[in-house]
């Protein structure tokens, strides 16, 4: 519910609208206590809404304090509160280390809540004063008042906890109604219900009669306590004083036939513990803590800590599984195919796991790690696996987590301690075998608070996680039935011991054809539904989708593609809302109108920049997928200097030195004057200077750039290359072949030069459809690279000029 007014009225039988001094004030719900007029009450304010209420008070510190009907309700609604409370003024606010507040509030007068005008972020209500019925002075009133004083003095005198000053204060109060309020607020044994009943009693004579009854009962309890004390004193040692006092309280309650809230809490928790199906050692620990709770006062500092701990133990799914039954492999395959296009290797590995799981249900599950660029479906694949298995899906993001306690929890000695994210996820799942996704595991940080990745070692080790021990719970929990799935954009930041525990499954980028299929099968229907558009209102042509892919996105995944499709759908929704159209056929021209000018230059960028000799296109791998990389070389008069710029790493700088050495040693064969290097300086630059770059795979690109510059031969149009070189001129294999190839295709490259040893990777990772329109050359030496990348005669140079002009639309095709 937002900050909207709610006309919520109490239907209390004693409600009377007989006051005209209505006020609208902040309302503070309290539990296990009642604030009386003229009494000062210390309150611990911990709920977020209550903290916001106190912090919002300005110069006017007046609030309304109302007791809850049930103390266990954490987020009370108007129906959970009594109708009568106290108008109060806040005198002092102390901030506690655990972000809660310690507030001193003084009651002013009784008020009745007539209407709640606000529920969030905190309650505000209209209240009116409850007038007190003052009977005329009479002998009966005088007798009741004196009896109250007498009984109260006897109780204070016989109580080891009540101060004698209370009797003195009570004797100095002449007004009978105020005396009753003082006595009621001073008796710790009076229940919240009884205190509220006295607060709601406007007639002073009736109020005197009620407090007399409670005092007589309390005095009887006190006398009985003294009797019990004499019976048990010989059996209790001085070192067991706290236990002895709890026994007294239990014996008193037994004699009176009463049971307080704490006893009821203990009984309810005991039932939950018995029904939770805990292992014997865990149940023993829970019952031990229950015994402590039963002997503890609800006002004790450790009461809520112990209660929360037992509740956590009781609600965890110790024996509760998903009950999905036997795994249906054909159905699982259909679900994976329905949710994701292609990804055949990934699906095969998942189906292999499910098949083994069907044959051996108690097998230790592998830890799968989906590695790949953003937007390729890593997280959604985890959801599909959960659906195929018929299990709950839980996801937590580890990006930016620096504290080890986020994984394993805080110890109970800390204020506000809670279990870690893993056990909280298990509780949310309500089963002990969910599919548990740890997202962005490569972005876990570390600092002085610990290393979260080290805390994951136990949880992600199938040999150890059958007894995972959270710091807060401090009892073993079996995680062996959980199917853990992690995701990462790159594997290098993941510590080696953690990476060793996971089975890496690469999810590589999509080709244009795959993106088209994904757009029509998943993205367009989803965006139509999200934007309230039916299939009859919009029709995307394949050419329009391809235009978005080529000229408005350059990515390995499909997030920006979906974002642009969503933009088109929203603009159509606006046209329909304005009555301008009822149906739209989306064509390439429509895309330009709705999305503006082209954001990505395909073909033309490469053709334009490689017109000059010395500029060559390389291929690079990035965590977001592959990309093209321009390498530029230039020369000037000098003394043989060699400059390298572009935020280059050490490995890349060494590749440049090797490239220059090879060119110098083969200058004669290449037709380059050997004295040229002594009289000129050479500068190699890799643009996008703000982006760090490293790796050996640009070696062939640098050699080609130098030879192109020194022989004045521009790179052949729409050609790109990758490969590591040696000083002897051999071309060595590189990694990330699929990502680099798909990046080249996205950029409009038509010819790719690759090391011959990478042919096997191309055959395994790429389909003929993905390679359609691309000519791939596999080379073993740098001589083969130069033969393909640079024109060898005037005829080829003229042909290259015509091809480049066609791409740039500079001259008609010849």
Swiss-Prot record:
The active site is at 697, 740. Induction: By heat shock. ATP binds at residues 372-379. It catalyses: Hydrolysis of proteins in presence of ATP. GO terms for biological process: cellular response to heat; protein quality control for misfolded or incompletely synthesized proteins. Residues 1-20 are annotated as: Disordered. Residues 25-219 form the Lon N-terminal domain. GO terms for molecular function: ATP binding; ATP hydrolysis activity; ATP-dependent peptidase activity; sequence-specific DNA binding; serine-type endopeptidase activity. GO terms for cellular component: cytoplasm. It is found in: Cytoplasm. Belongs to the peptidase S16 family. ATP-dependent serine protease that mediates the selective degradation of mutant and abnormal proteins as well as certain short-lived regulatory proteins. Required for cellular homeostasis and for survival from DNA damage and developmental changes induced by stress. Degrades polypeptides processively to yield small peptide fragments that are 5 to 10 amino acids long. Binds to DNA in a double-stranded, site-specific manner. This is Lon protease. It comes from Koribacter versatilis (strain Ellin345).
